[in-house]
């Protein structure tokens, strides 16, 4: 680089130049030289320590041949293309320079290099293998021709120069303009300029005023404004800077920033982003400048790939006050600032009020029919920003490198949030830099530097931008900010816009030269003397840094064949569909980027939007961003005079790969899960930009239709503009009992469009709205304050705006309350997930209610006129709120984004309403409604939302994923396929066998629920569900006093006493009077031990007092005969049956649990005693005392109905007396009775006939105490896991009321009370069964203890406990009365 004095080494002479052949290997940063001029091209600069320097190339050498192709008369562009196509060793034939080293392209092109006055003939491109026609088309598309015209119009007309400018390549260097600025384009050979002259020229900035009347025309000063654009500020977040993988960290940092801003629900404030010559300012309409960021602090910028309205800006700051001087000691921090451009503000009529408020006049944009200050996307903003931070001095580059390095100098250890995958940014020490060659500006720099086409010295994988030869936009050759003349704007047309709006070039409002104003003259002089085209003030270290940046471009950008690069480097990314898949290839053939793409992008950037955006860090809190995170007030980096174009290399190189990473952000943000909502403000409101901080990141968001769901999160207004969004939002409000709000808003919206002259229509609609929503007797009243209430008389003079105030109130209510909850709801998350996966949007009736509110368990079909009733009843169950809370916490722990985590449940009462409101009330066999549901008894979280989850049509069920996730007891999980036609038990049997689990000793739960599932349901309803498998303890219990044995399945963590006490109590026995021991042992069993110690054991309960057992047994044997006749004949028993149902509804009797914890324990114990007494009175009539006790029980049960409905009465509070239980023979009577009692489901009643649910011998057929409920709802049909063991299957199905061979009809069986608790729970679930929902055992205690079988004390184990499955067992259809799991 420091070769300013080299002309002295090679004095020009008459002797012909020495020709030699060299081979240059490509280094990390390219070959290490830059080109200028053409026919032949001349090396304008050779970087110290580069491959070109090692082989002896010097500035001024002419290139005669490249890879055996003669390029002596080839154009500059063709030479650059040839170099760009070479990916390995470059073979060149060069002629050592004989003239001034600093010769420039304009001299050579104009023939000045050899003292001629006209252009040299050019070598035909065909000889070089380059399609000339293609290049012409590219030039036309990119605006190159316009640029030439623009150049010629800005130059003086005297002499042959105008013609030369038209004919020469666009990639001319700045030297000619520099000379022209000094001598009116007729300057002598540049070699005649001394270093002092050049320095003076640069210090005058005259290089930027070529063709202008005077330097004053530009009026350059430090405060000059380049552009200003109105953007919305979302928030800022500090980024980590301690990792080692640049690509990964870039993606993670941006993604993390977006995610946190979404989670914090930022409110977005409108600010004017002003890009000055060396800083970015944020200005509000009230507080003025609230933040200012020097260019030195800018690291890079990035656009959200799925929605280009959103963009981020990363800035740096040190922790110490020493600024850059202490960069080694101070810890460098980086922050990401996220902004949004709202295209809705693009049209002038919409934003003119905002423009007035901010105090500027709009600049018309004839290309887009909008205004430049209000861009339609974030790309124009980023283009100007990238221009600003590309120009940086070496010192700043070092600091920036530190921000993205992990301490060592390895560029690959870059951990920056920016992502230049391999820019030598990290190697910012001088030695390292010298090895980095000035590379082409790949996607963006190409246009900047020369023809905007290919790399001057073979940089970015053959991409190209010419070296630093003058940028092709004639007048603005001063590669001022981005190394490009003003970053030629993405619109070629913008090039003309500038001339249209600003008049002659001399009056351009975007003078890049101003950026240079901060460079000391000494630096500028050094720059000018370093190399010919760089005489524009570029210091040596700037070129070095520039080169390092290009080197990185080369490796990170590699062979993108479409000129696509990050907006950070200034180029406009094409549609994602047009980005080639090989863009990510790191090595291989370096395909040449189409010149047209680069030219077009650069021409647009240079003269495009006159608005700039910048990050703001020190923004003060305003009313609009009180919720936004505080911006870091980090110590400002000392502004350095060495802020030069070196920044451009750093920024651009890093930006190439950051765009790659951001491309991956499309899916990353969604995969991160929680798409939360935000408190948003109206996007057109005065002080805020309504946009959700949750950036909609959907991979398919390429077209409006595909990104429809994501756009709902942008603003509430956007949601209301989409009919589909309104539909889903309405469904959400319906679940929230506030659908009247959206209905009212829609009605008012329609009303406001009624013509004012149509009084009849206005009057009709006004009265309709008033009567439906606003009057005191409104059917669906909306919640508005008293000030907005309308009087009846106002309806006499209706006008379209009469409901505006009320509509605005409801609008704000929905926007700031319902809308934010909608964005957090599972319904919206399901829609987003479906959009990401390319599926059709889910049925809103299928998705559970929003987790945001615990009361939102209403039916999707619920009528808006009954919200209060529904909400009141939905809360009736005491376990409802508790379980919902558990569900919510579970969702927070797991995240609600996974398909199978949607196990939210809905109370039974609500589900009943779901059907009732739509005539789906499940009538029982003879027409009655399920009383238990209608009365809203205890809700169960285990069954929450079970019916809703399966209301979708069969067609949609087929489309849904047919699998579920089962979490096993050992902590592992597996995915199990579910198929229609196979029961849950059949599906699980294979799973249990594979994992060596006894299928009969497990229960299956929904994750987040505590109720076991009924395993005889069709397994297809578990699709996408998250399930939990829990082991249970199986053991046999012998009740010696009554000569009975039962098989039990219990929760292993329960103590023995807690499991046995309720069982023996149901048989009328007292555990305290019994001796508990294991079979074969004489020592009493420790009742405090966990029940898991009894797994597979036989437990014997013996009477300590043998006489009591005899009496009890004898009396119980005879009791059923009397009870049977009494029940069949006595009308009082019909009353008893009815009350039994009431008791069952309220308190379905449990198997498990000690009643000692209840305040009513004394009463319960008395009841048990009375039951035992009643059992003793066989063949005796009920006396007066007993009748009184009976009526007392009845009255208490009736009085407890209210408590039950309010969730205050626990089911264990009441125990059904034995004399109220029907004997087996009465089941026929119950089945044939005309009016079935409420509480019995249709399926329960018809279970015997339709499903063939046979009863096991002891459990049902021979038990006189079996209640109607238990008789009609066989445990085997609905029990979780199974009701009875295979051993009990020896009883074949038979008609109701019949007994199996060998049964003893007169033998009493108190265990039916135990079964009563379980069967009633399933009986209550029958409506869900009809609705296709998942059935769960609703009794809270059933999960802890389950009756597996019952028999005589001499019965073999096989009849009581299911044997463990053998490998030969194959799952088959469930047989009633069997218990195979």
From Swiss-Prot:
Comp. bias intervals (Low complexity): 849-869, 1261-1280
Keyword Ubl conjugation: yes
The keyword Transcription belongs to this UniProt entry's keyword annotation: no
Expression sites by tissue: Expressed in brain.
Gene Ontology cellular-component terms listed: cytoplasm; dendrite; nucleus; synapse
Function: Regulates G protein-coupled receptor signaling cascades. Inhibits signal transduction by increasing the GTPase activity of G protein alpha subunits, thereby driving them into their inactive GDP-bound form.
Record protein name field: Regulator of G-protein signaling 12
Organism: Mus musculus
């Amino acid at each position: 680089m420091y070769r300013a004095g080299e002309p002295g080494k090679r004095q020009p002479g008459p002797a012909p130049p020495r020709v030699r052949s060299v081979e240059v290997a490509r280094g990390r940063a390219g070959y290490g030289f830059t080109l200028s001029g053409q026919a032949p091209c001349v090396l304008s600069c050779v970087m110290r320590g580069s491959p070109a320097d090692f082989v002896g190339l010097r500035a001024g050498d002419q290139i005669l041949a490249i890879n055996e192709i003669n390029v002596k008369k080839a154009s500059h562009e063709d030479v650059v293309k040839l170099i760009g196509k070479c990916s390995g060793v470059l073979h060149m034939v060069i002629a050592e320079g004989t003239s001034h080293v600093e010769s420039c392209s304009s001299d050579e092109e104009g023939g000045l290099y050899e003292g001629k006055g006209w252009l040299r003939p050019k070598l035909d491109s065909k000889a070089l293998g380059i399609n000339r026609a293609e290049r012409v088309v590219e030039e036309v598309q990119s605006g190159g021709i316009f640029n030439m015209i623009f150049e010629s119009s800005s130059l003086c007309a005297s002499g042959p120069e105008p013609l030369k400018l038209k004919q020469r390549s666009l990639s001319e260097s700045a030297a000619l303009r520099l000379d022209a600025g000094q001598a009116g384009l007729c300057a002598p050979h540049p070699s005649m300029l001394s270093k002092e002259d050049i320095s003076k020229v640069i210090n005058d900035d005259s290089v930027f005023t070529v063709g202008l009347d005077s330097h004053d025309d530009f009026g350059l000063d430090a405060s000059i404004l380049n552009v200003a654009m109105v953007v919305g500020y979302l928030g800022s977040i500090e980024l980590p800077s301690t990792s080692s993988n640049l690509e990964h960290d870039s993606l993670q940092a941006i993604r993390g920033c977006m995610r946190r801003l979404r989670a914090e629900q930022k409110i977005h404030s409108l600010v004017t982003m002003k890009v000055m010559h060396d800083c970015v300012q944020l200005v509000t309409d009230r507080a003025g400048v609230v933040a200012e960021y020097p260019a030195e602090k800018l690291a890079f910028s990035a656009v959200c790939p799925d929605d280009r309205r959103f963009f981020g800006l990363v800035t740096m700051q040190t922790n110490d006050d020493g600024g850059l001087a202490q960069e080694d000691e101070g810890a460098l921090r980086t922050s990401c600032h996220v902004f949004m451009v709202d295209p809705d503000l693009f049209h002038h009529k919409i934003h003119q009020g905002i423009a007035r408020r901010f105090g500027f006049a709009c600049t018309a944009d004839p290309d887009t029919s909008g205004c430049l200050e209000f861009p339609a996307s974030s790309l124009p903003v980023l283009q100007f920003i990238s221009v600003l931070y590309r120009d940086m001095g070496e010192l700043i580059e070092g600091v920036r490198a530190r921000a993205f390095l992990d301490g060592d100098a390895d560029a690959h250890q870059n951990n920056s949030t920016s992502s230049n995958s391999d820019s030598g940014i990290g190697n910012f020490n001088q030695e390292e830099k010298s090895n980095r060659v000035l590379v082409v500006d790949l996607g963006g720099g190409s246009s900047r530097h020369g023809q905007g086409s290919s790399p001057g010295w073979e940089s970015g994988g053959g991409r190209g931008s010419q070296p630093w030869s003058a940028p092709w936009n004639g007048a603005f050759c001063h590669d001022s900010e981005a190394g490009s003349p003003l970053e030629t704007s993405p619109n070629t047309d913008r090039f003309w816009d500038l001339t249209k709006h600003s008049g002659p070039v001399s009056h351009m409002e975007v003078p890049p030269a101003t950026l240079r104003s901060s460079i000391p003259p000494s630096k500028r002089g050094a720059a000018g003397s370093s190399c010919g085209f760089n005489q524009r003030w570029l210091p040596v270290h700037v070129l070095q840094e520039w080169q390092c940046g290009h080197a990185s471009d080369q490796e990170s950008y590699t062979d993108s064949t479409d000129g696509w690069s990050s907006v950070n480097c200034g180029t406009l990314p094409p549609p994602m569909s047009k980005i080639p898949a090989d863009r990510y290839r790191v090595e291989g053939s370096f395909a040449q980027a189409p010149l047209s793409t680069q030219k077009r992008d650069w021409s647009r950037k240079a003269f495009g939007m006159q608005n700039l955006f910048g990050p703001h860090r020190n923004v003060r809190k305003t009313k609009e961003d009180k919720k936004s995170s505080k911006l870091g007030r980090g110590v400002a980096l000392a502004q350095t005079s060495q802020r030069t174009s070196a920044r451009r290399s750093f920024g651009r190189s890093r930006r190439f790969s950051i765009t790659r990473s951001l491309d991956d952000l499309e899916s990353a943000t969604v995969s991160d899960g929680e798409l939360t909502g935000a408190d948003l403000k109206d996007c057109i409101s005065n002080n805020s930009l309504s946009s959700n901080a949750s950036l909609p990141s959907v991979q398919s968001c390429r077209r409006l239709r595909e990104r429809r769901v994501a756009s709902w999160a942008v603003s509430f207004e956007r949601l209301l503009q989409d009919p589909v969004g309104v539909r889903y939002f309405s469904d959400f409000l319906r679940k929230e009992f506030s659908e009247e709000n959206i209905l009212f808003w829609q009605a008012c919206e329609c009303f406001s469009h009624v013509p004012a002259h149509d009084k009849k229509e206005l009057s009709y609609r006004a009265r309709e709205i008033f009567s439906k929503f606003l009057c005191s007797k409104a059917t669906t009243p909306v919640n508005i304050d008293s000030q907005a209430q309308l009087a009846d008389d106002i309806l006499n003079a209706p006008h379209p705006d009469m409901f505006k105030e009320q509509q605005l109130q409801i609008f704000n209510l929905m926007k700031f309350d319902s809308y934010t909850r909608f964005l957090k709801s599972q319904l919206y998350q399901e829609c987003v997930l479906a959009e990401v996966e390319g599926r059709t949007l889910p049925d809103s009736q299928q998705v559970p209610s929003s987790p945001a509110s615990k009361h939102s368990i209403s039916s999707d079909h619920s009528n808006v006129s009954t919200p209060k009733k529904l909400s009141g009843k939905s809360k009736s169950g005491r376990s409802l709120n508790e379980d919902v809370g558990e569900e919510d916490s579970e969702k927070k722990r797991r995240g609600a984004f996974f398909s199978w985590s949607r196990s939210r449940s809905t109370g039974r009462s609500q589900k009943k309403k779901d059907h009732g409101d739509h005539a789906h009330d499940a009538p029982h066999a003879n027409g009655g409604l399920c009383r238990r549901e209608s009365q809203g008894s205890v809700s169960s979280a285990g069954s929450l939302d079970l019916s809703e989850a399966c209301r979708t049509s069969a067609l949609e069920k087929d489309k849904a994923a047919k699998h579920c996730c089962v979490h096993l007891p050992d902590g592992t999980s597996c995915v199990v396929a579910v198929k229609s036609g196979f029961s849950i038990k059949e599906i699980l049997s294979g799973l249990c066998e594979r994992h060596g689990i006894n299928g009969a000793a497990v229960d299956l739960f929904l994750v987040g629920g505590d109720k076991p599932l009924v395993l005889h349901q069709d397994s297809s309803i578990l699709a996408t569900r998250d399930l939990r498998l829990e082991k249970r303890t199986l053991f046999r219990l012998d009740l010696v006093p009554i000569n009975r044995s039962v098989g039990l399945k219990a929760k292993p963590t329960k103590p023995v006493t807690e499991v046995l006490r309720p069982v023996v109590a149901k048989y009328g026995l007292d555990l305290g009077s019994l001796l508990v021991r294991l079979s074969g042992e004489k020592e009493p069993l420790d009742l405090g031990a966990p029940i898991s110690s009894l797994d597979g054991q036989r437990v014997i309960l013996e009477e300590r007092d043998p006489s009591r057992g005899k009496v009890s047994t004898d009396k119980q044997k005879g009791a059923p005969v009397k009870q049977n006749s009494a029940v069949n004949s006595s009308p009082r028993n019909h009353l008893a049956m009815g009350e039994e149902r009431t008791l069952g509804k309220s308190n379905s009797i449990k198997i498990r649990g000690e009643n000692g914890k209840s305040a009513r324990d004394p009463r319960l114990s008395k009841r048990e005693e009375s039951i035992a007494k009643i059992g003793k009175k066989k063949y005796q009539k009920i006396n007066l005392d007993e009748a009184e006790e009976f009526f007392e029980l009845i009255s208490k049960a009736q009085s407890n109905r209210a408590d039950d409905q309010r969730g205050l009465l626990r089911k264990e509070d009441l125990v059904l007396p034995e004399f109220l239980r029907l004997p087996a023979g009465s089941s026929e009577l119950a089945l044939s009775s005309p009016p079935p009692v409420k509480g019995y489901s249709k399926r329960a009643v018809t279970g015997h006939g339709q499903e063939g649910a046979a009863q096991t011998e002891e459990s049902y057929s021979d038990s006189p105490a079996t209640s109607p409920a238990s008789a009609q709802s066989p445990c085997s049909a609905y029990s979780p896991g199974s009701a009875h063991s295979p051993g009990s299957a020896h009883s074949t199905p038979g008609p109701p009321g019949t007994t199996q061979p060998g049964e003893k009809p007169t033998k009493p069986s108190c265990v039916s009370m135990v079964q009563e608790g379980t069967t009633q729970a399933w009986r209550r679930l029958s409506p869900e069964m009809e609705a296709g929902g998942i059935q769960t055992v609703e009794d809270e205690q059933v999960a802890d203890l389950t009756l597996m079988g019952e028999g005589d004390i001499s019965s073999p184990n096989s009849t009581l406990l299911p044997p463990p499955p053998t490998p030969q067992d194959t799952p088959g259809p469930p047989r009633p009365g069997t218990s195979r799991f």
